[in-house]
């Protein structure tokens, strides 16, 4: 994955403003729309050390994550006092396993993850520059089982007013990336003038949006 050094440096210097200390409230609010079953396999690309993994593992028997940063993966297990089984995989990745959770370290585009019934993307697509997003979407579609669903959280703001990441990914681009899939907007949270992205960054508008993407 390109820009690897950028993300390695972020974790190494603990510049992880994108990390949430709690479960993202949008996950429990909208997960039901994926029609989840306990036996559904869930994949979380570019998962970091997200608390969302813990929440998902209470709902599903198999939750997979992929994370470039070894620092993030080790921190995730250490902070929860989990002792994972660590297995080297093909010289490029390591697999960390504990109960329902399996996290691959390394490049998402080459990680040997299993296909999933549901993919949860809160911070992956918006972390990638525009020139990488088509490749990412193709990889996601490749990893989705027939009848699979994606719960996508994205951002929408004038890209020329702020350099990412996180980047703006408007609905038009989502529909283009997932052409042939059913794309449903579940929620648009439009920021007011007190939101830090508007108050501090000076953006003219900023919204966090939730989409359900279904294979037809």
UniProtKB/Swiss-Prot annotation:
Catalysed reaction, written as an equation: S-adenosyl-L-methionine + a thiopurine = S-adenosyl-L-homocysteine + a thiopurine S-methylether
GO biological-process terms attached to the record: methylation; response to metal ion
Enzyme Commission number(s): 2.1.1.67
PROSITE patterns referenced in this protein's UniProt entry, alphabetically: SAM_MT_TPMT
Signal peptide from the UniProt entry: none
A Pfam family recorded for this sequence: TPMT
This protein's GO CC annotations: cytoplasm
Protein's UniProt keywords contain Cell inner membrane: no
Cellular compartments annotated: Cytoplasm
Residue positions binding S-adenosyl-L-methionine: 11, 46, 67, 122
Enzyme class: transferase
Top-rank lineage group of the source organism: Bacteria
InterPro entries found in the cross-reference section: SAM-dependent_MTases_sf, Thiopur_S-MeTfrase_Se/Te_detox, Thiopurine_S-MeTrfase, TPMT
Presence of keyword Cytoplasm: yes
MF GO annotations: thiopurine S-methyltransferase activity
Keywords, in A-Z order: Cytoplasm, Methyltransferase, S-adenosyl-L-methionine, Transferase
Recorded family membership: Belongs to the class I-like SAM-binding methyltransferase superfamily. TPMT family.
The protein's name: Thiopurine S-methyltransferase
Record organism: Vibrio campbellii (strain ATCC BAA-1116)
Gene that specifies this protein: tpm
